[in-house]
Design a protein with these regions (language model features):
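Beta-strand-turn-beta hairpins that frame and shape the catalytic cleft
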Residues: 1, 96-112, 141-148, 255
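Pre-active-site segment of Zn-dependent metallo-hydrolases
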Residues: 1-41, 47-56, 157-164
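Active-site neighborhood of phospho(di)ester-bond hydrolases with catalytic His/Asp-centered motifs
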Residues: 4-8, 32-44, 63, 149-154, ...
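Structured loop/turn residues at beta-strand edges in well-structured enzyme cores
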Residues: 31, 84, 107-109, 166, ...
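Metallo-beta-lactamase
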Residues: 63-135, 244-250
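Cap/insert and terminal regions of metallo-dependent hydrolase folds
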Residues: 132-134, 142-147, 155-251
Length: 255
């Protein structure tokens, strides 16, 4: 069984492109995806849930604030209950806890959600400043001891996040923007990276990731304005020289 972190709008294409995510032969509308962990309520991270509505009940892990935002803005729980149903799970926030399967069995994985600074998504019907709007997930394999940190939306690098990055064997990190004014230079009046809730590679994350001892360091959530997407760019050369991989479809590594 597999754990999915966020469900993007192209989740069905991702499933079709991954042999391990195919249903068992003869299984009607089956899936080896056991649960979905949401890092926040952004549309790019949740629209794929609607594409998964025709199978068994969805097991979704997310902070209560994220759940409330999705129910208020997208009517998610009632809508899903009209199809496959949805079961919500509150992730542990301090100590690692087991990922329990729908059938009651425990996964070999344990996890915890690290609270990050963040704002509600644009579709939110009411601006809330309380609660946890964005998290990173740190996951440990009890069989191997390997640790993975997944942080696709980082508005600021808290000390808790920094410590988790230092102790992880693999880090998948927010690579949305290279520079603070990336969008502004293309379209005057656009928001800055900070206003959109992202640290930049040039000012923050590149030096941090370079310093880590993790075996695998990967940038994800990369905006199409980011010059690192061009293999010949000087920005891409800096990233690769730091031992960081640009995330891509089909990328695999073992923790």
């Amino acid at each position: 069984m597999w754990t999915l972190i966020n469900a993007s709008p192209d989740v069905t294409a991702q499933i079709r492109g991954c042999e391990d995510l195919q249903p068992e032969a003869g299984e009607l509308r089956g899936t080896p995806i056991s649960e979905i962990l949401l890092t926040n309520a952004d549309l790019d991270h949740v629209l794929g849930l609607f594409c998964l509505r025709e199978g068994r009940k969805l097991q979704v892990h997310a902070p209560q604030t994220v759940r409330d935002t999705l129910d208020a803005g997208l009517n998610l729980t009632p809508m899903m209950n009209a199809f496959c149903g949805i079961a919500w799970h509150e992730p542990p926030a301090v100590n690692f806890g087991p990922i329990e399967r729908e059938d009651g069995r425990r996964s070999a994985l344990e996890y915890r959600a690290l609270k990050l600074p963040g704002k509600p998504p644009l579709f939110a019907t009411k601006e809330r400043t309380d609660g946890t709007h964005s998290v990173a997930y740190q996951i440990v394999d009890r069989d191997t001891g390997g640790r993975l940190l997944v942080a696709p939306d980082v508005a600021a690098c808290t000390e808790t996040l920094m410590q988790a990055m230092r102790e992880s064997d693999a880090v998948i990190f927010d690579g949305t923007f290279w520079s603070e004014d990336e969008l502004l230079r293309l379209k005057p009046g656009s928001r800055t990276a900070t206003q959109m809730g992202h640290v930049t590679m040039a000012d923050t994350s590149l030096s941090i990731l370079r310093s880590l001892q993790a075996r695998h360091k990967v940038y994800t959530h990369i905006n199409n304005t980011n010059p690192v997407l061009s293999p010949a760019s000087p920005e891409r050369a800096l990233v690769e020289a730091a031992g960081i991989v640009i995330g891509r479809d089909g990328l695999e590594f073992v923790v």
